[in-house]
């Protein structure tokens, strides 16, 4: 029986552990340099665009043009170290076309903690803006919330669900944040992402169908059409 004598000469084990330690240190240095010189480590903003593209391909049926446009827009925005304006995505479509699912995937693959990230802000009209009579109060609160959170983290995501149910005029307070200016209210907002979700029926009623034509709805959109607009 052959007896290994490694117990008498532990240098191999020590050198192996030293190699692991050096490799870990090198990996840490690379990550540190990336955080120092890149914009990927702001807050918990860690974009995983290949993972997003994979999940969209595997779990979102149809919507080929929409998927391609989402990925293309995000790549261009994330890779730009100094964007001139925030990324604005408008997702609209019929019920069941994947609007909410796409928005959750975006948060999941853009931030380390996904929708639980303190820098992902999800607004629901039923929860946050239930009383149209308080629109002016909501405007002040929304402006203060967006401004304060962008001051804390420029890489913030603001998700507005069911846009068709929001009090009229509420979104006017966001217009200064969506343009190409450098600073708004003393806040640099150009790295922010805004996502607006709207039901297609509301879009049709607000701008598609002539007034007074009840029931004049468009045919259901084909799966290949992209219910998405970017700014």
UniProtKB/Swiss-Prot annotation:
Q: Which Gene3D superfamilies match?
A: P-loop containing nucleotide triphosphate hydrolases
Q: Residues annotated as region Partial activation of MRGPRA1?
A: 192-211
- Any chance you could tell me the propeptide residue ranges? 28-189
What Pfam families is this protein classified in?
Torsin (PF06309)
InterPro entries on file: P-loop_NTPase, Torsin
Glycosylated residues, per the record, are: 149
The molecular function terms of the Gene Ontology recorded here are: ATP binding; ATP hydrolysis activity; hormone activity; identical protein binding
User: Which keywords appear in this protein's UniProt record, sorted alphabetically?
Assistant: ATP-binding, Cleavage on pair of basic residues, Glycoprotein, Hormone, Nucleotide-binding, Secreted, Signal
GO cellular component entries: endoplasmic reticulum lumen; extracellular region
Signal peptide coordinates: 1-27
User: Where is it localised?
Assistant: Secreted
- The record lists ATP as bound by 93-100
Q: Which family does it belong to?
A: Belongs to the ClpA/ClpB family. Torsin subfamily.
What task does this protein carry out? Salusin may be a endocrine and/or paracrine factor able to increase intracellular calcium concentrations and induce cell mitogenesis. Salusin may also be a potent hypotensive peptide.
| Record-given protein name | Prosalusin
């Amino acid at each position: 029986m052959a007896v290994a004598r490694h117990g008498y000469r532990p240098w191999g084990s020590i050198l192996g552990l030293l190699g692991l330690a050096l490799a870990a240190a090198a990996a840490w240095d690379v990550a540190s340099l990336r955080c120092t010189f890149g914009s990927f480590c702001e807050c918990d903003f860690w974009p995983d665009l290949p993972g997003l593209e994979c999940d969209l391909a595997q779990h979102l049926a149809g919507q080929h043009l929409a998927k391609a446009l989402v990925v293309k827009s995000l790549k261009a925005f994330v890779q730009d170290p100094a964007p001139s304006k925030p990324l604005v995505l408008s997702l609209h479509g019929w019920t069941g076309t994947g609007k909410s699912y796409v928005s959750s995937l975006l948060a999941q693959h853009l931030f380390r903690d996904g929708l639980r990230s303190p820098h992902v802000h999800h607004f629901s009209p039923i929860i946050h803006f239930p009383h149209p009579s308080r629109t002016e109060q909501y405007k002040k609160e929304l402006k203060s919330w967006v401004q304060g959170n962008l001051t804390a983290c420029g890489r913030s995501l603001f998700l507005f669900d069911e846009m068709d149910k929001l009090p009229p005029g509420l979104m006017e307070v966001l217009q200064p944040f969506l343009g190409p200016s450098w600073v708004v209210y003393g806040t640099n907002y150009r790295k922010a992402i805004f996502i607006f979700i709207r039901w297609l029926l509301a879009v049709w009623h607000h701008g598609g169908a002539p007034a007074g034509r009840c029931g004049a709805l468009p045919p259901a959109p084909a799966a290949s059409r992209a219910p998405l607009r970017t700014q």
